[in-house]
C-alpha cells in the first residue's frame, strides 16, 4: 500500500517492496547488500557455467569453488534460506526434515572444503557495497553470490527508514519519507532552497542505495562482462530480508550441530533447538 507514495522509476522496486507496513509503523529499506565471490575466469578451467542451485554449486568440479563455498557456508548459513519464520502464523517456513538436510549438507561441505587444501586464486569475497574492488584492469571475472534453497539470491537490508503511523502528524511523517526517497536526496544533488541546498551529498555508511543509478555508478570501472553478470544477479534476487535474531539462531544451530561427535548427539541438539524455536515463536 505504501508503494504509491514513491517514484518507482528511480528506485529498486524489488528492494522497496520488502518493506514492512502494519497498523503501527512503516519500515522501508534504504540500503541493501549481499556477498559476491569473484574469480579470474581463466583460473576456473573446469567450469563453463556457475549453478544457481546451492547443492549443485557446492558439488561443482572446480576445487576453488568447492572450497570457498564450503568456507563461507558456515559464516552465511542463514543466507542459504530465504525467510525461515512466518511471524503471523508463528510457524517455521521449512519442515524439520528440510532444515536437517541443509545442516547435514553444510557440515559435509565444510568438511570436504577443509580437506581440499586448495590454493584459491580468487579476487576475494566482496560485498555489493565493495564492487569497485573488481574494477581497474578490466579483468574478466566469474562472479556469483551464494544461492538460497529456492534457487534465487538473498539481499539483506542494511539500513532502513521508519515512521510511527500513530504519530500526531501522520501526513507530515509520510511526506518526510517521500522527501527522503526523492531523487534530489538519493542522488546527492540536494533540495534547492532560497540561497542554499539542503540534504546534499548524503552518504550511507553501509550497503548500496535503493536509488537505481547508485549501482550503475559503482559498476562503471568494471569490465563489460562483469557488469553484465552483476545485472543478471540483480534480476535474480528473489528474497529481500531484514536481519533478525533468527540469523544468529541458525548460525548457532550449525555451530553446535557440527561440534557433536556422533549422529545421536547431533539429533539431540537438533530436536532440542527446534523445540526451543517453537516456544520462542509463541511468545
Task: Label each region the model flagged.
Residues 3-114, 165-171:
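Helix-loop-helix "hinge/cap" segment bordering the ligand-binding cleft or interdomain interface
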Residues 101-171:
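Extracytoplasmic/periplasmic substrate-binding proteins
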Residues 28, 35-37, 75-77, 127, ...:
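Short catalytic/ligand-binding loop motif for oxyanion handling, primarily in non-cytosolic enzymes
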Residues 44, 179-210:
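Periplasmic-binding protein-like
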Residues 168-180:
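Short amphipathic alpha-helical coupling segments at ligand-binding clamshell hinges
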Residues 202, 206-283:
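Conserved C-terminal helix/tail region of periplasmic/extracytoplasmic solute-binding proteins
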Amino acid at each position: 500500500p505504501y508503494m504509491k507514495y514513491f517514484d518507482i522509476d528511480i528506485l529498486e522496486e524489488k528492494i522497496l517492496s520488502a518493506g514492512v507496513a502494519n497498523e503501527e509503523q512503516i519500515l522501508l529499506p534504504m540500503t541493501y547488500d549481499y556477498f559476491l565471490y569473484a574469480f579470474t575466469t581463466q583460473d576456473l578451467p573446469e567450469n563453463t557455467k556457475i549453478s544457481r542451485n546451492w547443492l549443485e554449486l557446492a558439488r561443482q568440479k572446480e576445487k576453488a569453488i568447492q572450497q570457498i563455498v564450503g568456507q563461507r557456508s558456515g559464516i552465511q548459513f542463514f543466507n542459504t534460506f530465504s525467510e525461515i519464520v512466518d511471524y503471523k502464523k508463528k510457524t517455521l517456513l521449512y519442515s524439520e526434515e528440510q532444515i536437517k538436510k541443509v545442516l547435514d549438507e553444510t557440515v559435509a561441505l565444510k568438511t570436504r572444503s577443509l580437506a581440499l587444501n586448495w590454493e584459491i586464486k580468487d579476487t576475494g569475497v566482496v560485498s555489493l557495497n565493495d564492487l569497485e574492488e573488481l574494477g581497474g584492469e578490466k579483468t574478466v571475472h566469474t562472479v556469483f553470490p551464494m544461492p538460497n534453497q529456492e534457487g534465487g539470491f538473498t539481499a539483506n537490508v542494511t539500513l532502513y527508514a521508519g515512521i510511527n503511523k500513530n504519530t500526531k502528524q501522520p501526513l507530515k511523517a509520510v511526506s518526510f519519507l517521500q522527501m527522503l526517497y526523492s531523487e534530489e536526496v538519493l542522488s546527492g544533488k540536494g533540495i534547492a532552497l532560497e540561497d542554499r541546498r539542503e540534504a546534499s551529498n548524503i552518504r550511507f555508511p553501509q550497503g548500496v542505495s535503493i536509488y537505481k543509478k547508485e549501482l550503475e555508478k559503482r559498476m562503471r570501472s568494471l569490465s563489460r562482462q562483469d557488469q553484465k553478470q552483476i545485472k543478471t544477479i540483480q534480476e535474480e534476487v528473489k528474497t529481500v530480508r531484514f536481519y533478525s535474531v533468527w540469523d544468529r539462531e541458525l548460525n548457532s544451530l550449525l555451530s553446535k550441530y557440527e561440534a557433536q561427535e556422533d549422529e545421536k548427539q547431533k539429533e539431540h541438539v537438533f530436536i532440542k533447538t527446534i523445540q526451543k524455536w517453537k516456544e520462542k515463536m509463541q511468545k
